[in-house]
Amino acid sequence: MDVEGAFADEEELAPHGGWASKDFDPSEFGYDDDFAPDDSDEDEDDDDYEFDEDDFAAPDFGEDYTEEEWEELERSLGIERREHLEESLCTVAIVGRPNVGKSTLVNRFIGRREAVVEDFPGVTRDRISYLSDWGGQRFWVQDTGGWDPNVKGIHASIAHQAELAMASADVIVFVVDTKVGITETDAVMARKLKRADVPVILVANKFDSDSQWADMAEFYALGLGDPFPVSAQHGRGGADVLDKILESFPEEPRAKSIVEGPRRVALVGKPNVGKSSLLNKFAGEERSVVDNVAGTTVDPVDSIIQLDQKMWKFIDTAGLRKKVKTATGHEFYASLRTRSVIDSAEVCVLLIDSSEPITEQDQRVLAMITDAGKALVVAFNKWDLMDEDRRWELDRELDLQLAHIPWAKRINISAKTGRALQRLEPAMIEALENWDRRVSTGQLNNWLREAIAANPPPMRGGRLPRVLFATQASTRPPVIVLFTTGFLEAGYRRYLERKFRERFGFNGTPIRIAVRVRERRGKGGKKQ
């Protein structure tokens, strides 16, 4: 068999570059994103890797090693484990009518721009929780859409979300507009808040100059105590409000909140593919505003949800627009944050509309997930709309457009009817178990000997590269590092990945296979 020719004609199906995994630094092992040989001078740390190529090339290499010896080598490569923490945190809900500056205030409280801010009402449509830290105390800050008692349609749903936030918070911050004064909606909301069984803090926002002190007097008529003059845009007065929030928190929150414990799931896909409907089906409540208009969800919406087997932290994203560069304003920031959501997630559920052809948008989101090295489950939603002709077309699309991810679990669901939703959790658990999984160095090198014996590496530059040794450098995603005497072609790395999956499985997670070229040393330890 002409191994070199067979691999030379093979197309590149899946990128192995794009080191988006934050736990892995390719430069630590002397190779770059394209797996090029390391021609740089070795530093002092390379003294730990003085390999005798003749020993490593022996057929029985490593067979007499104990697991302790393998583990010692792995520790020298800096493999780390990440712990998951649990803690109970209080929640403060930021409420008020539309366009009084709630999201700007949230960004001040959390010290970063996460809540979408635009100078027109209705940008925030869901209630979204952000983690904040003030004076050494951590707590949740919950942003809400604008509340209005007389609205209909999607705006009524937004108002309902604000009411749900008020019902679950430990402290409520009621935001009014100093420049506008008290409106009828403010008065109605104040009467509602006076009946709340938790502390309410009145914040008069847009207090931009001392000349507005006279305007503060009217807010006492709301009956909610002294108003705090604040300019969220300029950062004025926010510290006093945060101090008051901490002072008002109860000793124990209403409900236990888990910060690091649940595994993080990103629900991603193009707009109107059913992400919010799926989240609501899992949560059993109206957690995310749903409407037939594409792009209803603007902010990422986090929900802690108990499914059959585990607690999960679901993140419902805004969906990617056709081209980020053509998006404007709040949609531009929401699209950028979708990328950030993928980076911060552990497993991504990619929702694809099964009733429509797979689009370039679907492919682009998929590429973002695999480049980020995240565990993956592909869910084909709206299966209740499928007919036989469309199923035949979809089978052809899968063969052509998703052939590079045969390792990803595919599930046909309907968020509307609940079809097959019970299959999603086992698929996510399996994907995460493999994403976290590490193969012992002994098992890895036993497999490697067999794979190379069956198909040796192709010639390169008239020389046959020799694979000396392999180790799994990290997890999340699994990264296999091969120490060799020469560069390995991309086709041969794909062959090794296929053989690796045949032996060890690893369904649901991408695998990185990297090459560390060991230069031959002459007498005196100098490179040749």
UniProtKB/Swiss-Prot annotation:
Residues 437-519 form the KH-like domain. Residues 90-253, 263-436 form the EngA-type G domain. Residues 1-12, 30-62 have a biased composition (Acidic residues). PROSITE patterns: G_ENGA (PS51712). Residues 1-62 are annotated as: Disordered. GO terms for molecular function: GTP binding; ribosome binding. Disulfide bonds: none annotated. GO terms for biological process: ribosome biogenesis. The keyword GTP-binding applies. SUPFAM superfamilies: P-loop containing nucleoside triphosphate hydrolases. The keyword Chloroplast does not apply. InterPro entries: G_ENGA, GTP-bd, GTPase_Der, KH_dom-like, KH_dom-like_a/b, P-loop_NTPase, Small_GTP-bd. GTP 1 binds at residues 96-103, 143-147, 205-208. It holds the Pfam family KH_dom-like. Keywords: GTP-binding, Nucleotide-binding, Repeat, Ribosome biogenesis. GTP 2 binds at residues 269-276, 316-320, 381-384. Transmembrane segments: none annotated. Belongs to the TRAFAC class TrmE-Era-EngA-EngB-Septin-like GTPase superfamily. EngA (Der) GTPase family. Associates with the 50S ribosomal subunit. GTPase that plays an essential role in the late steps of ribosome biogenesis. This is GTPase Der. The lineage of its organism: Bacteria, Bacillati, Actinomycetota, Actinomycetes, Mycobacteriales.
